């Protein structure tokens, strides 16, 4: 017995001595994953963000789902109600160079989500502190001709009220073997609609129906999605004013290709009182080396004589961003070229112009009378923004962004403008964000423009 143990020990020593230096180095490499399973570290994991009210299954909660009930169609529903929303309150001043507005303004968005199943739900939303024209509740300090006054704007009309689901999940008995490819998404009611990153369409409340074919597998890509759109009410034209006689017809497409994601849209807007229009857009999203890029081309065509609601033109737009080495920060350069008088098909009253994605100096804040430092219409002009966004803290709960923006008319008009601005954001707790904005702008043949704001955003 002792002889056998001695032979085994000598064999083990021989095996270790014959191990290659590379194998030994690999075992001692600190970057090598351990063979021992590590426990899940949940001590520093944030608590579940409970909504304002939840009945039924918990939002992002652990445990089993309700048993539910079966519909005659075969669908199994287990309804749950989640009530959530956000509150925005800001003190802000905006000086255009000719007039100054200083105000305290508030907005409240409340939503009730009835989750019927994983793919079916009904969402109802209200904005009780603003009216249907996008005017908010608050207190006005300037201009003087308005006097110091409070303004109470409210509306109990639902800003959101729609149902969405999937045909195959609503009627599973039609295709028990899952061979008919009933992957058709359905959305009906008052809902937001954004196309081409908000350049072609940007409206937070439009009455529409859409039917979407998901999970198509073309030979030249991994995923193709096609949607048909029809809208009949709450349609604001490109000048942000509602056209009560307008109807919108559209096709929206999305495809994942080996090196790019491509979005394409084709729209026709018919009106009984204003000019009809054709609209088209195509965009490509990809990485070129270490640079994330987006390129978009959008076109508007007035069928008859153009007016403020629809004009003919082309908008070229590009975004580029990267993370500088050894940081988690973002350096970005965005630019546009507006050829003739491009007009968006649909723009909500708070959406501003089509160039909001160019940068902070072009974006509308969507709250009160605080405008964009630089014009975001983009007609017959070219411009862009250079910005640097920094993140601070282990959890990146603090951000600071500096941006330089500018534009110049391309038709010989006066109107060159340059703006420099900054935004600071700080997370407070798990539901609140403090936002500070400031800018200064120089415009050709005009006085300086400046503005600043402090906003508190609470999500619940």
Briefly describe each language-model feature range.
Residues 70-73, 109-111, 162-164, 210-212, ...:
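Outer-membrane beta-barrel architecture
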Residues 10-101, 111, 115-119:
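N-terminal periplasmic/intermembrane-space "pro-region" immediately following the signal or transit peptide
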């Amino acid at each position: 017995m002792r002889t056998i143990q001695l032979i085994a020990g000598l064999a083990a020593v021989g095996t270790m001595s014959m191990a290659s230096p590379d194998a030994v180095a690999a075992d001692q490499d600190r970057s090598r994953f351990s063979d021992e399973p590590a426990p899940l570290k949940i001590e520093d994991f944030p608590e579940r963000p409970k909504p304002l009210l939840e009945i039924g299954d918990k939002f992002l909660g652990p445990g089993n789902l309700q048993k539910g009930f079966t519909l005659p169609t075969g669908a199994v529903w287990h309804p749950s109600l989640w009530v959530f929303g956000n509150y925005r309150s800001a003190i802000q001043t905006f000086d255009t160079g000719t007039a100054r507005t200083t105000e305290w303004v508030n907005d409240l968005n409340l939503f009730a989500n009835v989750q019927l199943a994983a793919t079916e739900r009904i969402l109802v939303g209200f904005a009780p502190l603003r009216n249907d024209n996008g005017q908010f509740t608050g207190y006005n300090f300037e201009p003087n001709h308005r006097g110091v006054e409070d303004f109470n704007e409210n509306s109990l009309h639902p800003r959101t009220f729609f149902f969405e689901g999937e045909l195959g999940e609503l009627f599973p008995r039609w295709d028990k073997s899952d061979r008919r490819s009933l992957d058709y998404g359905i959305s009906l009611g008052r809902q937001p609609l954004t196309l081409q990153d908000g350049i072609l369409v940007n409206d937070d409340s439009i009455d529409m129906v859409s039917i979407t074919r998901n999970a198509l597998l073309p030979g030249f890509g991994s995923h193709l999605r096609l949607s048909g759109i029809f809208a009949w009410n709450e349609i604001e034209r490109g000048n942000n004013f509602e056209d009560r006689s307008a109807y919108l017809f559209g096709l929206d497409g999305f495809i994942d290709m080996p090196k790019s994601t491509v979005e394409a849209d084709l729209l026709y807007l018919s009106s009984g009182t204003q000019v009809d229009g054709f609209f088209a857009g195509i965009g490509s999203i990809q990485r070129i080396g270490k640079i994330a890029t987006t390129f978009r081309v959008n076109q508007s065509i007035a069928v008859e004589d153009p007016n403020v609601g629809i004009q003919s033109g082309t908008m070229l737009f590009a975004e580029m961003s990267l993370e500088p080495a050894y940081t988690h920060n973002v350096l970005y350069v965005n630019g546009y070229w507006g050829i003739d008088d491009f007009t968006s098909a649909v723009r909500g009253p708070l959406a501003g112009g089509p160039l909001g994605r160019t940068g902070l100096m072009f974006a509308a804040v969507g709250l009160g009378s605080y405008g964009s430092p630089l014009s975001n219409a983009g007609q017959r002009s070219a411009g862009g923004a250079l910005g640097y966004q920094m993140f601070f803290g282990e959890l990146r709960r603090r951000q600071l962004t500096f941006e330089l923006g500018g534009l110049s008319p391309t038709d010989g008009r006066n109107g060159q403008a340059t703006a420099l601005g900054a935004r600071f954001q700080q997370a407070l707790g798990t539901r609140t964000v403090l936002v500070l904005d400031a800018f200064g702008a120089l415009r050709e043949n005009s006085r300086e423009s400046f503005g600043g704001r402090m906003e508190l955003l609470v999500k619940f």
